[in-house]
Amino acid sequence: MSNSHTLFEAAQAHIPGGVNSPVRAFKGVGGDPVFFESAKGAYLTDADGKQYIDYVASWGPAILGHTHPDVIKAVQTQAEKGLSFGAPTEIETTMADMVCDLIPSMDMVRMVSSGTEATMTAIRLARGYTGRDKIVKFEGCYHGHSDSLLVKAGSGALTLGVPSSPGVPACLAQETLTLTHNDSEEVKKVFSEIGDQIACIIVEPVAGNMNCIPPEDGFLETLREVCDESGAVLIFDEVMCGFRVGLTGAQGRYNITPDLTTFGKVIGGGMPVGAFGGKKEVMQHIAPLGPVYQAGTLSGNPIAMTAGLKTLELISKPGFFEELEAKTTKLVNGLQKAADEAGIAFTTNQVGAMFGFFFSEEKDIRRFSQVAKGNMEQFKAFYHGMLDEGIYLAPSAFEAGFVSSAHTDQDIDDTIAAAKKVMATL
């Protein structure tokens, strides 16, 4: 019996399901979750002392790998000065300046403590700014677990949304329209009929919660156009893809300017953090400048700001993202070749240092319905095979993978070799 199994059994006594976030429970792949004790660079070490090459990266933040010495040193220095003050600090301003310098669409930014808090508040701000209630989201995109966003589509594009979780009031869900991701025509149709009632569109410009799904040509442009025509606010949820697919995020990569953007993950350097920001015209409606309320005890926490600032400084160095993307391409191509040699129906997607793979006959996967049709049994078998080989992937067929600057060419080669071995058994 493994130490992870023993720890999981003990955890379930007082933690619901034994985990503090559902995907960690391994329900998507079966078996016990792995409990980790330490991490360094591209490697995780579990409670039994086994090492794994890590492609989960704490679900995205660890773009530099784990325990980067410069980040650790900066955090230790700040910790000696104080963990939290509940008052303004200079580093909050320094961090805000850097984010706004890197992201041209951001005139102002507000720091919060999680991605969910960022998206929740961005939607509240859009509603307050426009005086409208309805919002548009897309099937397969995840924007945290606030009530307005735990909604699935009704029977048609204009049908009232229905809650996707108990505890979400139907009256709130009715204000959320869930449309087909990457379907420009459906977006145009909805806006032609009720565009003057819609406060905002929120979208992951690179969807990372139905694996890794890039935008189809013209999709993001359509969102910008209908928002301009209707007066709705365009929100890019870059909590996952921001500072991951490039230094200027997905909006820089695809040259689309949103009105508001949400960030998280990478900008905290491994600490809990979120942020939302955008055009001054919109942001000046947030308290204390305006009437739209938002507050947080740990917003702008100096430890999180320190870790995030150091991370942004390091990833801003010339050539960082080019090297990271090249590593990711090598990995993705190697996985595809391993599957092809084994005669396995397999497809990969990549945007920058984000990647995804699908056990599927389809070769151009751009929508949630395509992801859901994948061979989940093959995915589970592949997942556990790779785990046995010391490769830690996301324990869900609906989550993206991440490469860090700590991954070496040898790490990539070892991962591809493991994939060849496992693919041959499927």
Swiss-Prot record:
**Keyword Isomerase annotated:** yes
Family statement: Belongs to the class-III pyridoxal-phosphate-dependent aminotransferase family. HemL subfamily.
Query: What's the cofactor?
Result: pyridoxal 5'-phosphate
Q: Which domain of life is it from?
A: Bacteria
The record's principal subcellular location, in a coarse class, is cytoplasm
What does the record note on quaternary structure? Homodimer.
Q: Name one GO cellular component term.
A: cytoplasm
Which GO molecular-function terms appear in the entry?
glutamate-1-semialdehyde 2,1-aminomutase activity; pyridoxal phosphate binding; transaminase activity
Q: List the HAMAP family.
A: HemL_aminotrans_3
Mark the residues carrying the PTM N6-(pyridoxal phosphate)lysine.
K265
Please give the Gene3D superfamilies that the UniProt record associates with this protein. Answer: Aspartate Aminotransferase, domain 1, Type I PLP-dependent aspartate aminotransferase-like (Major domain)
A UniProt-annotated Pfam family: Aminotran_3
Indicate whether Nucleotide-binding appears among the record's keywords: no
Q: Name one GO biological process term.
A: protoporphyrinogen IX biosynthetic process
Entry's localization field: Cytoplasm
Provide the reaction this enzyme catalyses: (S)-4-amino-5-oxopentanoate = 5-aminolevulinate
Listed InterPro entries: 4pyrrol_synth_GluAld_NH2Trfase, Aminotrans_3, Aminotrans_3_PPA_site, PyrdxlP-dep_Trfase, PyrdxlP-dep_Trfase_major, PyrdxlP-dep_Trfase_small
EC primary class = isomerase
What is the protein named? Glutamate-1-semialdehyde 2,1-aminomutase
Q: In which pathway does it act?
A: Porphyrin-containing compound metabolism; protoporphyrin-IX biosynthesis; 5-aminolevulinate from L-glutamyl-tRNA(Glu): step 2/2
EC number per UniProt: 5.4.3.8
Which keywords fit this entry according to its UniProt record? Cytoplasm, Isomerase, Porphyrin biosynthesis, Pyridoxal phosphate
